[in-house]
C-alpha cells in the first residue's frame, strides 16, 4: 500500500509540473503493485479447489502429559498447476492446550506436487481441542503483494486424562465374595454381568433376584464368566486440580480392573451415564476413557450430592446387583453417607475419600463408611495415585 501511494504521489507531482521523468518514476511502483497483485491473485491458495489438505494425528486420542505427532500434507488436486505450491508459506494453528502458548515449530519437506509439515504437540489438559485450519501465505515475486488464506478444516484432538498402571490384587477381587462385611450379604462370584433375556436362553441362567427387582427377565452373561463385575463411582468435585486428580484416579482404577478381566463400569454422575445400556455390554478401554473427556465438575455440594445419589440408584443396572463398588468420593452429607451405607448391604465397597487428615467432614465420612463395612482410605488431592491405591488394597497386589 505504501509503495502504491508513493507511486501515485510521484506520478501526480510529475503531471502537475509537466515532468515526464517524474511521471515515469511514479508509474513504475504502481505497475509493480498491480503486477504483484495479479500474480498472487492467479494462484490465490484460498481460491478454487487447486489445493487439498490431509492432517493425521498419532496417537489420537492422547493422554495428558503425552506427545502426539501431527503430519499435514498440502498437495495439488488433479490438474492443478505446480505454481500453486511455489513459495507457499504454511503456518499451523493449535489450541493453547496443545501448543502450550508457543508457536508450533514444524519440519517442512517440499516435493514437486506436495508440501509436508510434521510437528509435535504436547497435551496439557483433558478435553477436546482444536487443530487447524492451516494458514497459507503467498508473496509475489517482487515482494510487494501478499495474500493470506486458510486451508482445510478445523479438526479436534481428544485428550484423555493422565492414568497410571495400577496392580490388581487378584486374591481380593476374586475371593472377595467369600468375605463377609458388616451387615452385608455377598453374592456369589458367578453373578457376573447381566443382560436382557433373549428367546432361547437357558432358564437356568435367569438371575431371579435381579429379575424380580426390575420386573423383567435378565440372565447371567457368558462374557468373562466367573469374574466379578466392578463399578467405579466418581463423585466429581468443583473444576480445578482436585477434579483432574479424581478423574485420573477413577480412570486408572477402571482400566486396571478392566485389564484384569473384570466387567467394569464407570459412573460419573452425568447425563451420559446409561447403566441400563452398560449392563448389556461392558465398555472397553476406549469407552471408559471417553466417558471422562467432557467432565466439567459439579458447581456446588448440592449438585454433587444429587449426582452421586443418581449413580447409586443406577448401581443395580450397572452390575446386576452384585460386584465390587470402588468409589472416589468427596466429603459427604447425611444423605450421601446414608445412601453409601446402603450400598454395602448388598455388595462389598472400597472408597477413596478426598480430603486431608485435618478435614473433619472427610474424616467423618471415612469413619461412617468404615462402620457400614466399606474398606476406606483418605487421601489429599495430588497424592501419588499408586501409593493411594496401594493403601486401599492393603499392598496385596
Give residue spans per PLM region.
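Short, structured coil/loop segments at alpha-helix boundaries
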Residues: 19-23, 83-85, 95-96, 112, ...
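Intrinsically disordered, low-complexity regions
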Residues: 15, 19, 27, 80, ...
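Extracellular/lumenal glycan-associated context and N-glycosylation machinery
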Residues: 1-54
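Acidic/proline-rich low-complexity IDRs
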Residues: 2-5, 133, 165, 368, ...
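An amphipathic, basic-hydrophobic helix/alpha-beta surface used to engage anionic
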Residues: 35-279
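Exposed, interaction-prone extracellular/peripheral surfaces
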Residues: 162, 199, 203-397
Amino acid at each position: 500500500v505504501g509503495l502504491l501511494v508513493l507511486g501515485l504521489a510521484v506520478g501526480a507531482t510529475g503531471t502537475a509540473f509537466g515532468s515526464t521523468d517524474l511521471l515515469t518514476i511514479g508509474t513504475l511502483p504502481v505497475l509493480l503493485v498491480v503486477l504483484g497483485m495479479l500474480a498472487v491473485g492467479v494462484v490465490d491458495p484460498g481460491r478454487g479447489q487447486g489445493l487439498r489438505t490431509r492432517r493425521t494425528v498419532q496417537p489420537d486420542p492422547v493422554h495428558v502429559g503425552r506427545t502426539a505427532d501431527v503430519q499435514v500434507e498440502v498437495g495439488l488436486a488433479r490438474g492443478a498447476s505446480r505454481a500453486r505450491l511455489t513459495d507457499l508459506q504454511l503456518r499451523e494453528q493449535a489450541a493453547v492446550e496443545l501448543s502450550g502458548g508457543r508457536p508450533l515449530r514444524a519440519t517442512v519437506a517440499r516435493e514437486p506436487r506436495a508440501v509436508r509439515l510434521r510437528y509435535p504437540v504436547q497435551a496439557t489438559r483433558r478435553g477436546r481441542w482444536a487443530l487447524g485450519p492451516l494458514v497459507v501465505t503467498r508473496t509475489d515475486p517482487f515482494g510487494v503483494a501478499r495474500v493470506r488464506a486458510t486451508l482445510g478444516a478445523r479438526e479436534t484432538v481428544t485428550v484423555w486424562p493422565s492414568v497410571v498402571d495400577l496392580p490388581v490384587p487378584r486374591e481380593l477381587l476374586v475371593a472377595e465374595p467369600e468375605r463377609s462385611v458388616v451387615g452385608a450379604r455377598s453374592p456369589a462370584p458367578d453373578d457376573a454381568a447381566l443382560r436382557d433375556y433373549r428367546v432361547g436362553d437357558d432358564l437356568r441362567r435367569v438371575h431371579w433376584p435381579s429379575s424380580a427387582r426390575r420386573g423383567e427377565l435378565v440372565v447371567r452373561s457368558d462374557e468373562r464368566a466367573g469374574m466379578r463385575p466392578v463399578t467405579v463411582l466418581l463423585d466429581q468435585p468443583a473444576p480445578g486440580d482436585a477434579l483432574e486428580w479424581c478423574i485420573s484416579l477413577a480412570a486408572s482404577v477402571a482400566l486396571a480392573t478392566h485389564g484384569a478381566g473384570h466387567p467394569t463400569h464407570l459412573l460419573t454422575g452425568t447425563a451420559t451415564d446409561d447403566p441400563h445400556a452398560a449392563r448389556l455390554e461392558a465398555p472397553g478401554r476406549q469407552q471408559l476413557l471417553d466417558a471422562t473427556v467432557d467432565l466439567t465438575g459439579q458447581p456446588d455440594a448440592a449438585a454433587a450430592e444429587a449426582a452421586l445419589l443418581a449413580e447409586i440408584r443406577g448401581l443395580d443396572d450397572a452390575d446386576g446387583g452384585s460386584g465390587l463398588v470402588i468409589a472416589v468420593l468427596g466429603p459427604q452429607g447425611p444423605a450421601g453417607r446414608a445412601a453409601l451405607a446402603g450400598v454395602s448391604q448388598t455388595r462389598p465397597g472400597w472408597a477413596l475419600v478426598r480430603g486431608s487428615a485435618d478435614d473433619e467432614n472427610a474424616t467423618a465420612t471415612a469413619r461412617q463408611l468404615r462402620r457400614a463395612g466399606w474398606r476406606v482410605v483418605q487421601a489429599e488431592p495430588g497424592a501419588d495415585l499408586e501409593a493411594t491405591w496401594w493403601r486401599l488394597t492393603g499392598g496385596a497386589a
